[in-house]
């Protein structure tokens, strides 16, 4: 499938889209290179609740039939996690359905993430990534942040500044 057939849009999730979003999250998590038991144990902590989604900006990628095949969620980033004197949005989650991975959908979702960040007039986007996902974000212009407070800060934080016109 060509990525032009995929639409990317911000949404206000309802019950049906919550289920569709969580199907994408479940498929992505179950595709991780971890022991099956570990994936089953961690999966519930990655699934979204309706209450959580009300406090997040939600962006979905849909195929032409309307099926959700990717999701990105954003929230304000804590000041301690951002580079010094910077304000940012935290990319809370970025998930692509396994059958749609490696087709540019993650990049398209990130493009919309940066449009949201630009509109919010923040300095950049912060990611707390799984170690295996770091190369994906580095290839898209993110830089690894060295923890200044290893007891408090997540080890795999990445930052990309919002380009101002």
Where is each model-derived feature located?
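A short beta-loop-alpha structural element at the N-terminal edge
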Residues: 6-23
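Conserved active-site tyrosine of GNAT-family acetyltransferases
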Residues: 137-138, 142
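Conserved catalytic-core motifs of GNAT/GCN5-like acyltransferases
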Residues: 126-128, 143-160
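Acetyl-CoA-dependent GNAT
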Residues: 15, 24-93, 97, 110-111
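Conserved GNAT acetyl-CoA-binding A-motif
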Residues: 117-130
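Conserved acetyl-CoA pyrophosphate-binding loop and the N-cap/start of the following alpha-helix
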Residues: 100, 104-112
């Amino acid at each position: 499938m060509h990525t032009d057939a995929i639409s990317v849009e911000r949404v206000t999730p309802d019950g049906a889209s919550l289920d569709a979003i969580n199907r994408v999250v479940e498929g992505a998590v179950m595709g991780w290179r971890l022991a099956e038991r570990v994936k089953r144990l961690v999966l519930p902590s990655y699934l979204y609740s309706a209450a959580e989604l009300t406090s997040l900006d939600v962006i979905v990628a849909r195929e032409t039939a309307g099926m959700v095949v990717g999701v990105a969620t954003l929230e304000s980033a804590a000041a301690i996690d951002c580079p010094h004197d910077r304000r940012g949005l935290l990319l809370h989650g970025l998930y692509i359905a396994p059958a749609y991975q490696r087709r540019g959908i993650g990049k398209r979702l990130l493009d919309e993430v940066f449009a949201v960040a630009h509109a919010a007039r923040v300095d950049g986007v912060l990611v707390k990534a799984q170690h295996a996902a770091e190369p994906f974000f580095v290839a898209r212009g993110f830089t690894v942040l060295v923890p200044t407070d290893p007891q408090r800060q997540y080890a795999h934080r990445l930052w990309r500044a919002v380009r101002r016109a």
